[in-house]
């Protein structure tokens, strides 16, 4: 039995590399086992091709991390430096929030608005309005002079142009359409544009960015994810031309089971995790946003909105719900 890793040459050609020797196999659409290799290559997880003694081809999950393994290198002593928070040189701009001028500011953080150098993941069902509501918030900050960027890996220029009549403010937001670079090093394109320095970046979506870079750069899924998370962390810290402590809003896709697509590292490394959901039946026009994790603000508070003639946040309901929560909390204290 032999096992092979899969390397994508282009959309119709794959290269199989033996895990035990230097053997390489080229598989194109004319190969009788094309469908086996193509299905494995398009899987959401890293898979290996196994060829047994009888000549049968199957695929299996990379349980042993073959794709991520590297030749063993001599280990060097690690020099560890401990730090004290009092000794850190903290940029005061990290505490200057970016406010949209809407009730969303109260919803986002206790300071009000987006905080520099933070990462917010947003998940929700298709069609619930994730991109629409987040782009509108982005446009409000752009109008105020903030450097705002939209990275679109799902929609092209024509898709976005259809929104202009309803949301004219979107017309001046700088946008990177990653599909334009599918065959021209999308990894370098992303690194280059982020190096310019931005206050706030909206990415739609993490999965599509990951898949685009993974395919063109021949990286494993886990390595691509690590690269993108490291890239965000770099710009959180202000390592760009303008020394901007970039805040990232990243849209995540949902699986059929209702969980976000990606590793748990996505959730653990995020400052906040938000869901945008329907209330009641799908397409009922009753939608709400809710944080299930938020290091800089409240969780489990619902902010309702609708998309009738633009985006309308139900500030009265949000304020009323907060007041009710305070009254309930006060009553519980008195009973204790």
Feature names for model-found ranges:
Residues 137, 226-241:
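Catalytic-core regions built around general acid/base machinery
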Residues 237-336:
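Phosphate-binding/switch region of NTP-binding enzymes
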Residues 121, 200-204, 249:
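Structural motif
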Residues 12-24, 29:
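A short, exposed loop/beta-hairpin motif centered on an aromatic-Gly-Thr core
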Residues 3-9:
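A short beta-strand micro-motif
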Residues 67-167:
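The Walker A/P-loop phosphate-binding site
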Residues 144-230, 320:
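Conserved inter-motif catalytic segment of the P-loop NTP-binding fold
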Residues 34-71:
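Short, mixed-charge low-complexity intrinsically disordered segments
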